[in-house]
């Protein structure tokens, strides 16, 4: 992509990988030759696959999940063809997967739970943050926040309780709307955003967190995935 600067190639590759759950390489024009960044999924060792194509590359380096590379213009199509021919990914491996620690009804979300989770930090590749799931929660209202309109604040009521809690879903790819439209139509989506659709049910994957605003401390959920269902 001649319009993308090499400094943001990794960000673009990461977003495309997240949206489509596919290994992704973004090439930019570069100063002397095309340069690129690669981002991968757990099932595809990007560094190993690029190593099989090192005769086509000027330079490359990285690890299974990410890499950087440079190559001549005439080798771009050759690299694409060889990577695709060598790819052994199955349809099952391309299904996005989120591993949860356990199902946790929202009535068990507490300040103590958040403190206990924070005591396990720092989180990273070898020590992932715990993720929980709950089914059939009720979304009373949704608010769209942020300069880019990509943060969804959900007012959630658990099925077994009248205690409400806010949930935040950060979305840079349009996934929230895409997921909603698997069950409802465009008109319903607009009504949902306007707050006139009524209660919506969903299953969520989340982790509990604390929100501090104007001296007030409240519990909130950070939602990592959502699946809407009909009432």
PLM region spans:
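Short glycine-cluster motifs
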Residues: 25-40
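Conserved beta-strand termini and adjacent loop/short-helix elements that scaffold enzyme active sites
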Residues: 1, 27-29, 103, 170
């Amino acid at each position: 992509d001649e319009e993308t600067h090499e400094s943001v190639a990794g960000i673009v590759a990461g977003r495309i990988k997240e949206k489509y759950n596919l290994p992704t390489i973004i090439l930019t024009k570069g100063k002397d030759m095309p340069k690129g960044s690669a981002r991968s999924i757990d099932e595809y060792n990007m560094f190993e696959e690029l190593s099989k194509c090192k005769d086509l590359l000027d330079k490359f380096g990285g690890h299974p999940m990410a890499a950087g590379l440079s190559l001549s213009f005439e080798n771009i199509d050759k690299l694409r063809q060889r990577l695709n021919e060598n790819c052994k990914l199955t349809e099952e491996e391309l299904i996005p997967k989120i591993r949860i620690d356990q199902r946790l009804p929202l009535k068990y979300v507490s300040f103590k739970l958040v403190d206990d989770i924070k005591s396990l930090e720092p989180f990273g590749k070898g020590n992932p943050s715990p993720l929980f799931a709950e089914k059939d929660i009720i979304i009373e209202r949704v608010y769209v926040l942020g300069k880019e309109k990509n943060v969804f604040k959900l007012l959630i009521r658990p099925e077994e309780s009248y205690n409400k809690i806010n949930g935040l879903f950060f979305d840079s790819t349009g996934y929230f709307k895409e997921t909603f439209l698997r069950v409802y139509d465009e008109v319903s989506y607009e009504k949902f955003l306007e707050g006139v659709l009524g209660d919506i049910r969903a299953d969520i994957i989340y982790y509990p967190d604390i929100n501090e605003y104007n001296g007030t401390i409240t519990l909130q959920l950070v939602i990592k995935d959502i699946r809407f269902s009909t009432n």
